[in-house]
């Protein structure tokens, strides 16, 4: 009996060593899978030229351009298409840069075209914008901030399928007409009202909220999206979509003006370059309760300001802080 124990212990030790090795291998496998995450591929291009137009320049494609998303769906844009970057609300151009600058260009062309044709749902079109940014090298936290911005403040629509009856008639040899009612399926576009960013009051809140979303995502490397009275909102794509839908509804009803806590934590309504906005101090995202206890802070301090949870009495003061600085960006004459 006594001599059996060491042998048994050696056997257990060997099994444990194998399990540890398997765990290490599995860990490397997960890391490699994350590093190799696939977001899709663009065709060559886009090639085209910029055309002077009112109210903003247009970019005209001189050849076909497309994106294959990670689900295998192709998003083609034909030669001759003209886009103007308007699918990204112009308010945010001063924050992210022009839509035809840097790593946004390819995703912006695809996004613009499908926001104009509305041949696919707004949900899929905006999600594809995120995939396109990631495929072109935009960091995850920044792409999520942009995804939230277009899902919240960009165009919105749904596609609805219904049955309609089409009447077809033809003359008879006796002077009459015979008719047939032919039912068929059609798909219609149902557009939803956009948030009115020409209203300075709504614009101040929209910019302040976006700044807070960007700071949360930057601090957490894309893991945390929002701080609400109900708790912390994760930075998953599904959470971004739900949060954006709720924000659109809140702006549509103006409920936030009666109960500003619904906005959650926001920042100063300043137009700050996305790359320049500060992370939260010490890399720690505060709780909603901690920010609420501070009241409306004075301007200054962090780039983007300190966190704010508004009360009804503070709205006027907050809205007067809206930054209306001009937006400057450069357009090349053409792209090849």
UniProtKB/Swiss-Prot annotation:
Residues 1-33 form the signal peptide. Pfam families: DUF1353 (PF07087). InterPro entries: Phage_CGC-2007_Cje0229. Keywords: Plasmid, Signal. It comes from Sinorhizobium fredii (strain NBRC 101917 / NGR234). This is Uncharacterized protein y4jT. It comes from the Bacteria.
């Amino acid at each position: 009996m006594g001599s059996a124990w060491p042998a048994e212990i050696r056997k257990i030790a060997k099994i444990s060593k194998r399990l540890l090795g398997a765990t290490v291998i599995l860990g490397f496998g997960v890391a490699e899978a994350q590093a190799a995450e696939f977001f899709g591929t663009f065709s060559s291009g886009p090639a085209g030229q910029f055309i002077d137009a009112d109210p903003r320049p247009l970019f005209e494609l001189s050849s076909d351009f497309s994106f294959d998303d990670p689900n295998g769906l192709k998003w083609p844009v034909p030669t001759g298409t003209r886009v103007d970057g308007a699918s990204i609300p112009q308010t945010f151009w001063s924050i992210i840069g022009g839509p035809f600058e840097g790593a946004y260009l390819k995703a912006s062309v695809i996004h613009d075209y499908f926001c104009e044709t509305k041949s696919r749902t707004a949900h899929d079109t905006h999600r594809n914008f995120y995939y396109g940014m990631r495929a072109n090298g935009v960091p995850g936290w920044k792409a999520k901030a942009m995804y939230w911005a277009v899902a919240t403040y960009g165009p919105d629509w749904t596609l609805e399928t219904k049955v309609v009856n089409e009447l077809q008639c033809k003359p008879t040899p006796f002077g009459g007409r015979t008719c047939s009612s032919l039912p068929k399926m059609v798909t219609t576009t149902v557009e939803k009202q956009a948030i009115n960013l020409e209203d300075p009051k709504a614009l101040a809140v929209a910019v302040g909220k976006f700044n807070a979303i960007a700071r949360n995502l930057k601090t957490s490397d894309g893991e945390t999206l929002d701080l609400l009275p109900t708790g912390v909102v994760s930075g998953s794509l599904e959470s971004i979509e739900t949060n954006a839908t709720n924000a659109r509804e809140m702006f549509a009803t103006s409920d936030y003006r009666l109960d500003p806590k619904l906005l959650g934590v926001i920042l100063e309504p300043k137009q700050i370059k996305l790359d320049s906005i500060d992370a939260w101090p010490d890399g720690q995202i505060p709780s909603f309760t901690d920010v609420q206890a501070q009241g409306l802070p004075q301007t200054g301090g962090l780039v983007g300001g300190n966190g704010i949870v508004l009360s009804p009495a503070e709205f006027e003061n907050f809205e007067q802080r809206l930054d209306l600085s001009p937006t400057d960006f450069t357009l090349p004459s053409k792209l090849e």
